[in-house]
Amino acid sequence: MQRKEANPFQILGLRPWLVKQLTKLGLKGATPIQQKCIPAILAGQDCIGAAKTGSGKTFAFALPILERLSEEPVSHFALVLTPTHELAYQISEQFLVAGQAMGVRVCVVSGGTDQMVESQKLMQRPHIVVAMPGRLADHLTGCDTFSFDNLKYLVVDEADRMLNGDFDESLSIIERCLPKTRQNLFFSATMKDFIKESSIFPIASDCFEWSQDSDVATVETLDQRYLLCADYDRDMVLIEALRKYREENENANVMIFTNTKKYCQLLSMTLKNMEIDNVCLHGFMRQKERVAALSRFKSNQIRTLIATDVAARGLDIPSVELVMNHMLPRTPKEYIHRVGRTARAGRKGMSISIFRFPRDLELLAAIEEEINTKLTEHPIDQRMVERIFMQVNVTRRESEMQLDNNDFDERAQNYRRKTWIMEGKDPDQMEALYRKKQKDKLREIRRKRKLQHAEPAASEEGKALLQDERFKSVDSARFEKKGKGRSRATQEDTPTKPLKRLNKEKPVAQKGRADVKKDKA
């Protein structure tokens, strides 16, 4: 009689009920970070785990916490800190799914909802609290209706971002309210020295550390590509690349990243006005709107999501086939997080990043050095880009007018002021500082532009990349700024399958008086 092989999760020390639940979820084996970190956490060690995006980091800490919670089901057993609303809700969902058999209670504290409602949920004795630092600090300083006296686990997810200094004030308040005898678990896509040297959360001397060994920071199943554009036709290049991809992959899910909240909203409106259904996700949206947008995308009701970097970290949407960088991330690390939304858990995926030639070559060189991989050029029909130039420009202008009519800038200012007031800061003083920063930023952008116009590739990295075989044959004249006489492709050179609106017949112009007289004659 053939001996039945033990379940991989059972070997790690998890109870049969939890192993059975994981089997129901279709998980056949543990990922490397789960194999290494789960036994260490169950053994009572502090843990620092680093692995690529999509490697199963959430279950690496959620499973051992649920295992121990089933032995001692007390309230406020574990606290998970995370930097974004969306990630907080995703982590809570994974706790609920894995702990369904034991009836685990999870509370999300992330702002965007009524603080009194959150307070009531915290009073209902949840087992797990998943929180953003700022809102949890507000609860801890504003009321004493709950405590973390029973806390056994503190988890800091996306630790490289959480401990970089931006959240220190809130984290210090939280630390003072937590018991000293607990396990500290830190998880991130990258291992950083400052995690071990954190002055806010002390790390035990016997802390277990594990980092995924790889020279390549992105997964092998990810096909990474680039597109070159000029300053004036980035939107056209994006739309044509999206149109072509949709022709071949009609039911694929696509995430498009851009850098600012306003442009995220503007790009979303522009695509909608061109009959490309999409939802957007950015920080100025209400929490209900953000959750609804993400739910529609996750459930495949809408196949295109346009987002800022609030969606770049940690979000697990398994069915994303393509990530597009409409505007490039500011650092190679953020690039890794963005493209990590696709090709997750062994699946294949593609990323297409749009680089302005030659000004973005320095960033391309930095990204390729960081990921130890060369990007390949994505094919695009330049004649089609030329053809839709006018339509996209006009549609974007219409969208800008709609955005101005909706008082987007005024609502953004009100949002900032409300946030500063809640943080106990002087809104007028903070607004003055904000405007000064914006002016300095604009001045720096203009300075860089002057350098780039004076010399196409100002940095040594950019100069070296211009000598790369990929760019030697590039016609730089194509990327120079053109005026009113901008050339457009002729009808004979144009492909026959453009965007939907491009195929619509133009309305017949009404005849003027002169035309009517001619007809009568």
UniProtKB/Swiss-Prot annotation:
Pfam family name, one: Helicase_C
Enzyme class, UniProt record, top EC level: hydrolase
Residues of the Helicase C-terminal domain: 237-386
Record domain Helicase ATP-binding: where: 38-209
Residues that bind ATP: 51-58
PROSITE patterns per record: DEAD_ATP_HELICASE, HELICASE_ATP_BIND_1, HELICASE_CTER, Q_MOTIF
Name by which UniProt lists this protein: Probable ATP-dependent RNA helicase Dbp45A
Enzyme Commission number(s) from the entry: 3.6.4.13
Keyword terms: ATP-binding, Helicase, Hydrolase, Nucleotide-binding, RNA-binding
PANTHER family the record matches: ATP-DEPENDENT RNA HELICASE (PTHR47959:SF24), ATP-DEPENDENT RNA HELICASE RHLE-RELATED (PTHR47959)
Ranges in a coiled coil: none
Motif DEAD box positions after renumbering to this chain: 157-160
Biased composition range(s): Basic and acidic residues: 460-482, 502-521
Catalyses which reaction(s): ATP + H2O = ADP + phosphate + H(+)
Signal peptide per UniProt: none
GO molecular function, one term: ATP hydrolysis activity
Purpose: Probable ATP-binding RNA helicase.
Family as reported in the entry's similarity comment: Belongs to the DEAD box helicase family. DDX49/DBP8 subfamily.
The keyword Cytoplasm belongs to this UniProt entry's keyword annotation: no
Region (Disordered): 448-521
Single GO cellular component term: nucleus
GO biological processes: regulation of alternative mRNA splicing, via spliceosome; rRNA processing
